[in-house]
Amino acid sequence: MTQDSAALIADMDQARAELWQIVAALDPEIDVCPGWNKRDFYAHIAGWEAIVYEVFLYNTTGTPLKDYPYNNLDDLDAANAGFVAERQSGTEDNIKLECEINRYAIKRMLNDIPVENFDKPIQFPWGKLTATKFVQDAIKHERDHAADILKLQQPLT
């Protein structure tokens, strides 16, 4: 891992910490995003990161990717609904823990990518990305969620 990749991963950690702080302050029953309470929001994150974990596992060990019923990730609404539905029986704390375990595993895999491979394309279900681009996109995704949640929580004027 290079200093640049370590800094990117640190930024990814910071974006997650900021997002978690915002979500933690919310009532469990209010909408974090339209139609999603906190548990559903964590289920969304857990679902996507489970796929990312599998992609990195496949790229390092050749372990086949799981076949999801909504594998056409061009339909993001169906994928997100699937992630939430899969976790309906889980508690908010357990689903958040799944997020944290997935993120830990992803970071370990990122740390194990040789420097010369960090900018090689990796096939994700939604397209090819380098590890660098994946981390940049993860940071943006979490910061976008944080901004959207804060905006949704603002009183109407």
Where are these regions (language model features)?
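Short helix-to-loop capping/linker segments positioned immediately adjacent to catalytic or ligand/cofactor-binding
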Residues: 26-32, 90-95
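Extreme N-terminal tail/first-helix region
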Residues: 1-14, 94
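Acidic/histidine-rich alpha-helical segments that form the ligand environment
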Residues: 75-118
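Solvent-exposed, charged/polar functional surfaces in cytosolic regulatory/catalytic domains
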Residues: 18-25, 105-109, 148
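A non-catalytic, amphipathic alpha-helix used as a structural packing/dimerization or gating element
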Residues: 11-18, 97-105, 140, 144
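Short, contiguous alpha-helical
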Residues: 28-78, 120-157
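A general structural signal marking secondary-structure boundaries and capping sites
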Residues: 23-26, 110-117, 156
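Short amphipathic alpha-helical segments at helix-loop
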Residues: 1-4, 33, 84-91, 126-130
